[in-house]
Amino acid sequence: MIKTKKNRYEVYALGQHICMSPHKARRVIDQIRGRSYEETMMILELMPYRACYPILKLVYSAAANASHNMGFNERDLVISKAEVNQGTTVKKLKPRAQGRSYPIKRPTCSITIVLKNTSVNEEEFKRYQYTINQPGGLITKEKYTDMRCYDMYNNGGLWDKK
């Protein structure tokens, strides 16, 4: 097992068991990889594919994780990694005439979206951590708190479509 170190500038969202072919989801994922968050949202809203909506929800969820958990600004987020993996296959039987049945295989996929904050420089963060760990340095970590008040009935216009 390879251990990967978690990056403090990255947040992710993982969607599993999405009823869609991985090949069809990769078509959309290849278009948004490496783009900014705002540009990605515009592209996904205007693309005519069925795979766009689950990916749009995942990107939106990853950005919400970034702003709520880490205090990142949505303008500074870039999709650093987006991957689609094959999931389990849902197997069903379709009844046919004269007591026969045909198998139906529905492919599923799992999608991982990783957003990276471009405003934070790694060297600044290391210097900040160094001053915290020094004796006589900062006693407590400064935590970014956002005191904006959101209008929860008017803010989420994305979820109206099905």
From Swiss-Prot:
Signal peptide: none annotated. GO terms for molecular function: rRNA binding; structural constituent of ribosome. Keywords: Chloroplast, Plastid, Ribonucleoprotein, Ribosomal protein, RNA-binding, rRNA-binding. It comes from the Eukaryota. CDD domains: Ribosomal_L22 (cd00336). InterPro entries: Ribosomal_uL22, Ribosomal_uL22_bac/chlpt-type, Ribosomal_uL22_bac/org-type, Ribosomal_uL22_sf. One of its GO terms (cellular component) is large ribosomal subunit. Pfam families: Ribosomal_L22 (PF00237). Its main location: plastid. The keyword Plastid applies. GO terms for biological process: translation. It is found in: Plastid, Chloroplast. This protein binds specifically to 23S rRNA. Belongs to the universal ribosomal protein uL22 family. HAMAP family: Ribosomal_uL22_B. Part of the 50S ribosomal subunit. This is Large ribosomal subunit protein uL22c.
